[in-house]
Amino acid sequence: MHSQTRAAVVTGAASGIGLALSARFARAGAGVVMADVEGGALHRRAAELIAEGARVTAVTADLTDPDAVERLAETAFDRLGDIDVVCNNAGVLGPVGQPLWEVPLERMRQVFEVNHWAHVLVARAFVPRLLERGRPAHLIHTASMSAFVVGAGSAAYAASKHADLAVARSLRADPPGDLRGTAVRVSVLCPGRVDTPMVEGLTAPRGAGGDTSVSAEDVAGVVWEALGSDRFYLFSNSDAPLRLRDQFDDVWRHVPLPPPSPEEELWPVPKTTTATTATTKH
């Protein structure tokens, strides 16, 4: 589908992954509507792409406001006509390094409003319009490895990403998701450490190979290659397999399993047999 992507909407498009996605689509010839609450930065980045010859529209929008998101959807369909890709990408890091009881409630609420509530609003505004048109389309939710792996002092961010993962899973096109049997595919993007302004000053995670961080352009490449496919989980960092295995191993250790029945034994013990010698008279 990426070769047929003619129109895309990207939220959180003023910087980081959102900007990289917008640039990837625009440089491939697609029309792009870029949305962000940071209007100044958004319009500067859009102007840079337009100077390259891109077909870009910048829309300043508070994505936590239902009316603003509805206006964004109306503008996007008016400007682009049919839309092939919606990247539900707006996000903030919020407070990190603090235990839950020290995080100001207003800050935690803000993180949930941007990382979760805004994604719900975008899905509610765009998906019905995509279904009405009946054409193939792809909805990309940007979650995080923090939707699976949680560290100390990350309650607000990790909890909001867990919530967004749940929304994406409820929407997915294969059973039992809400979009089963439709032409709208859903994927959830789960990057690890990405070198963007949002994480400047934070310590990069260390893996077996050292620093496992990637660029925003690397992440955009993962999304580009997945467009039109049935891939639901999109991982961008080399340490993802190890981190996921450790997480699910930890879960599995706490699952109370009943003793297997003989039919379920993976390696059943062979039954003992007694040889009988027959004597034949001649």
Swiss-Prot record:
Record field: compositional bias (Low complexity): 267-282
The entry's keywords: Antibiotic biosynthesis, NAD, Oxidoreductase
Function: Catalyzes the oxidation of 1-deoxy-11-beta-hydroxypentalenic acid to 1-deoxy-11-oxopentalenic acid in the biosynthesis of pentalenolactone antibiotic.
Organism: Streptomyces arenae
Record: residues binding substrate: 144
Keyword Oxidoreductase recorded: yes
EC number, UniProt record: 1.1.1.340
Binding site for NAD(+): 12-36, 161
Designated gene of the protein: pntF
Listed pathway(s): Antibiotic biosynthesis; pentalenolactone biosynthesis
Family from the record: Belongs to the short-chain dehydrogenases/reductases (SDR) family.
Taxonomic lineage: Bacteria, Bacillati, Actinomycetota, Actinomycetes, Kitasatosporales
Pfam entry (one): adh_short
Name of the protein in its database record: 1-deoxy-11-beta-hydroxypentalenate dehydrogenase
Gene Ontology BP term (one): antibiotic biosynthetic process
